[in-house]
Amino acid sequence: MELESLFSRSDRLVLFDTETTGLAYSKDEIIEFAAVVLERRDDKVQVMETYDELITLSPGGFVPAMIEKLTGISNQDIRERGVPKTRVCCDIARMFAGNTLLLAYNAHFDLSFLFYMLLRDGDVTILKGKDKLDLLTVYKDRRSYPHKLCNAIEAYGLSDKVVNSHRAVDDVLATVKVMKAMEAEKDDLARYIQLFGSHPTYGVDGKQIGSVTYKPQYYDPMQPLYEL
């Protein structure tokens, strides 16, 4: 069955992506959160929910010009369509509840931003005890540099199906396709659960996630990270 190794230990998979005002986890803010919820029903993997919301900013917060250029999300978009952080945090808690595996492409980045948003406006304990899988770490073991999501889309022949637009909803839909292509290529995704690759020279960007094991990951590894 599709994604058998992941569903053998989890009841639900939640793939997610964020767009943010910058790169500083504790200072910048999430402006868009998107997720795809997968569950196994009648021995088939089904999409149970596709979620996408723009998020209001704290007083004085704004979308920098370079972020608007990258994502197409403007300050006006946030004012007119953004929903409160507290509401998004409640939705995240609902999606993440139970025996759920959390997946993202560059998961350390997205989880770090989620941590601080949940800490301020929700229930950060929802992240505690959750298995986490970083598909960027998997891709770095599969292909040579560069390792952006757009590179994975091209490598797996998905350019006519999905797009890396730097909008969270597009990127998370692309991540779902990339994950399935990765599993079809080699069924070892479960071995990357709670294992994130880190920069071999600079280490982890920001604070480590307590439940995750970090190992230095080189651009052209001779063997999978889980065998080191």
Question: What are these model-derived regions, one by one?
Answer:
Residues M1-G129, C150-H166:
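Conserved non-catalytic scaffold segment of RNase H-like nuclease domains
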Residues L114, V138, T175-M179:
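Buried hydrophobic packing segments
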Residues L118-L119, R143, G157, K177-A184:
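Hydrophobic/aromatic-lined pockets within catalytic cores
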